[in-house]
């Protein structure tokens, strides 16, 4: 079952020490989605659809959630986002992406 977009975004932001910008988050989310799909027969990590924008892939719902922060750091604006259990295999992909 795919995770909620906000849950993955919160996990990545938190794992990155809340230092990522909108542009960085979009790219990390895209990488996580593509890596996860590649390893899991096309099953998505999270529900969402990316679009090709001038500066790279963008998930519009996520963009509108964090666009007010411009190129600055995104604080914890993901209310209602669920966490991931320690043994959740989706964490491996998100952890790997955050190391890049």
Where in this protein do the model-derived segments appear?
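Domain-edge interaction signal
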Residues: 1-100
């Amino acid at each position: 079952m795919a995770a909620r977009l906000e849950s993955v975004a919160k996990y990545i932001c938190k794992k990155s020490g809340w230092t990522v910008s909108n542009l960085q988050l979009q790219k990390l989310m895209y990488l996580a989605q593509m890596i996860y799909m590649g390893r899991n027969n096309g099953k998505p990590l999270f529900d969402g659809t990316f679009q090709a924008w001038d500066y790279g892939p963008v998930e519009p719902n996520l963009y509108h959630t964090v666009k007010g922060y411009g190129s600055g750091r995104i604080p914890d604006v993901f209310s209602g986002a669920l966490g991931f259990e320690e043994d959740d295999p989706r964490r491996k992909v998100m952890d790997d992406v955050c190391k890049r």
